[in-house]
Curated annotation (Swiss-Prot):
<comment type="function">
    <text>Participates in chromosomal partition during cell division. May act via the formation of a condensin-like complex containing Smc and ScpA that pull DNA away from mid-cell into both cell halves.</text>
</comment>
<comment type="subunit">
    <text>Homodimer. Homodimerization may be required to stabilize the binding of ScpA to the Smc head domains. Component of a cohesin-like complex composed of ScpA, ScpB and the Smc homodimer, in which ScpA and ScpB bind to the head domain of Smc. The presence of the three proteins is required for the association of the complex with DNA.</text>
</comment>
<keyword id="KW-0159">Chromosome partition</keyword>
<keyword id="KW-0131">Cell cycle</keyword>
<dbReference type="GO" id="GO:0005737">
    <property type="term" value="C:cytoplasm"/>
</dbReference>
<dbReference type="GO" id="GO:0006260">
    <property type="term" value="P:DNA replication"/>
</dbReference>
<dbReference type="InterPro" id="IPR036388">
    <property type="entry name" value="WH-like_DNA-bd_sf"/>
</dbReference>
<protein>
    <recommendedName>
        <fullName>Segregation and condensation protein B</fullName>
    </recommendedName>
</protein>
<dbReference type="InterPro" id="IPR036390">
    <property type="entry name" value="WH_DNA-bd_sf"/>
</dbReference>
<dbReference type="Pfam" id="PF04079">
    <property type="entry name" value="SMC_ScpB"/>
</dbReference>
<keyword id="KW-0963">Cytoplasm</keyword>
<dbReference type="GO" id="GO:0051304">
    <property type="term" value="P:chromosome separation"/>
</dbReference>
<dbReference type="GO" id="GO:0051301">
    <property type="term" value="P:cell division"/>
</dbReference>
<comment type="similarity">
    <text>Belongs to the ScpB family.</text>
</comment>
<keyword id="KW-0132">Cell division</keyword>
<dbReference type="InterPro" id="IPR005234">
    <property type="entry name" value="ScpB_csome_segregation"/>
</dbReference>
Length: 189
C-alpha cells in the first residue's frame, strides 16, 4: 500500500474537518517533510486528472478533499432533490444521532455509527437540517453539529424536548447492533 494511498484514505475519513501534517506524520510514522511532499504529489495528481472530481486544499493548516469548482452546479442540483426521496439510511441515522446527542462532533457520530459520516453530514447541511455550531475545546478543535430551526419545522415540533423519548438502554442496544455487538442485560433489571 503506497504512502499516497494511505494519505488519501486518511483525508477521506477526516472529511470536512481535514487533517494536519503533524497528524498524518504521527499516524504514518513518517517525517513531516515527507508528508508535505506526498501531499504535493497528491494535489498534482488530482489537478492533472481530468477524470477526477477531487481536489486537495489546505485551510488553516488542515488538508482536506473537496470537489473541483466545475462540479458545483451539478452538486447544487443534486442537493435540491426532495428530502423525502434523498435522505439515505445513513443520513437519517446521522440526523437522529445529532438530534438526540447534540452538540456532537463528526468523530463522535462516526464512533456511534461505526463508519465515516462526512457524506451524510454534507447532505444534511445542504438540506439545512443541521449546522456547525462552534468547535469542541479538544485537540484539533473539531466542529460541533446541531439541528436547525428548519429541522424543528420539518419534524413539526417547536422544541427538541418534543422529540420522542428514547430509553438510553434502547439507544445502547441500537448502537451495539450497528457495531455487530450484543448487549447482555443484567438479570436483576
Amino acid at each position: 500500500m503506497s504512502t499516497l494511498a494511505k494519505i488519501e484514505a486518511l483525508l477521506f475519513v477526516a472529511g470536512e474537518d481535514g487533517i494536519r501534517v503533524r497528524q498524518l506524520a504521527e499516524l504514518l510514522s513518517l517525517p513531516p517533510t515527507g508528508i508535505q511532499q506526498s501531499l504535493g504529489k497528491l494535489a498534482q495528481k488530482y489537478e492533472k486528472d481530468p477524470d477526477s472530481s477531487l481536489a486537495l486544499i489546505e485551510t488553516s493548516g488542515a488538508y482536506r478533499l473537496v470537489t473541483k469548482p466545475q462540479f458545483a452546479e451539478i452538486l447544487k442540483e443534486y442537493s435540491k432533490a426532495p428530502i423525502n426521496q434523498s435522505l439515505s439510511r445513513a443520513a437519517l441515522e446521522t440526523l437522529s444521532i445529532i438530534a438526540y446527542k447534540q452538540p456532537i462532533t463528526r468523530i463522535e457520530i462516526d464512533a456511534i455509527r461505526g463508519v465515516n459520516s462526512s457524506g451524510a453530514l454534507a447532505k444534511l447541511q445542504a438540506f439545512d437540517l443541521i449546522k456547525e455550531d462552534g468547535k469542541k475545546e479538544v485537540l484539533g478543535r473539531p466542529n460541533l453539529y446541531v439541528t436547525t430551526d428548519y429541522f424543528l419545522d420539518y419534524m413539526g415540533i417547536n422544541h427538541l424536548e418534543e422529540l420522542p423519548v428514547i430509553d438510553e438502554l434502547e439507544i445502547q442496544a441500537q448502537e451495539s447492533q450497528l457495531f455487530g455487538e450484543r448487549i447482555e442485560e443484567d438479570e436483576n433489571q
